[in-house]
Amino acid sequence: MGLTSQLLPPLFFLLACAGNFAHGHNCHIALREIIETLNSLTEQKTLCTKLTITDILAASKNTTEKETFCRAATVLRQFYSHHEKDTRCLGATAQQFHRHKQLIRFLKRLDRNLWGLAGLNSCPVKEANQSTLEDFLERLKTIMREKYSKCSS
């Protein structure tokens, strides 16, 4: 069952309108989800949140906002890819194991949303200062809250 040529123009028009509508609301929706994810992440105290991560936020003075989001997503992806099965993070109890799996799930969600805001395919990340994941997420949450307040006004 193929689409007739009469249906194609209205479908493309609807897709274009939906894309413009979503882009206008992207600021509020994406930022709200990022902030909620960051709130959940910073409340969690797991073995992995004390591990170090490349702190691209400390050296982001001469970068655009999109580059900062892209680099944050990149270092988060490197972190959770490296530590997903790390025995130091998995813990000895079932509760620690569950918290770790939840942490990884939240980091993946945050990564996906930051990539969406960045809109870039890739970005280089140079080795910089290190900080704990916990501190990195707190600083990222502050940045996102500031952006959300600008977006809302």
From Swiss-Prot:
Biological process according to GO: B cell activation; immune response; interleukin-4-mediated signaling pathway; negative regulation of inflammatory response; positive regulation of DNA-templated transcription; positive regulation of macroautophagy; regulation of immune response
Pfam family, one: IL4
Signal sequence, start to end: 1-24
Glycosylation site positions: 62, 129
This protein's UniProt keywords: B-cell activation, Cytokine, Disulfide bond, Glycoprotein, Growth factor, Secreted, Signal
Main localization, broad class: secreted
Family matches, as SMART domains: IL4_13
One annotated Gene Ontology cellular component of this protein: extracellular space
PROSITE patterns (alphabetical): INTERLEUKIN_4_13
InterPro entries: 4_helix_cytokine-like_core, IL-4, IL-4/IL-13, IL-4/IL-13_CS
UniProt entry tagged with the keyword Secreted: yes
Compartments it resides in: Secreted
Matching SUPFAM superfamilies: 4-helical cytokines
Disulfide bridge map: 27-151, 48-89, 70-123
Entry keyword annotation includes Secreted: yes
An example molecular function term from Gene Ontology annotations: cytokine activity
Family named by the database record: Belongs to the IL-4/IL-13 family.
Function text: Participates in at least several B-cell activation processes as well as of other cell types. It is a costimulator of DNA-synthesis. It induces the expression of class II MHC molecules on resting B-cells. It enhances both secretion and cell surface expression of IgE and IgG1. It also regulates the expression of the low affinity Fc receptor for IgE (CD23) on both lymphocytes and monocytes. Positively regulates IL31RA expression in macrophages. Stimulates autophagy in dendritic cells by interfering with mTORC1 signaling and through the induction of RUFY4.
Protein name: Interleukin-4
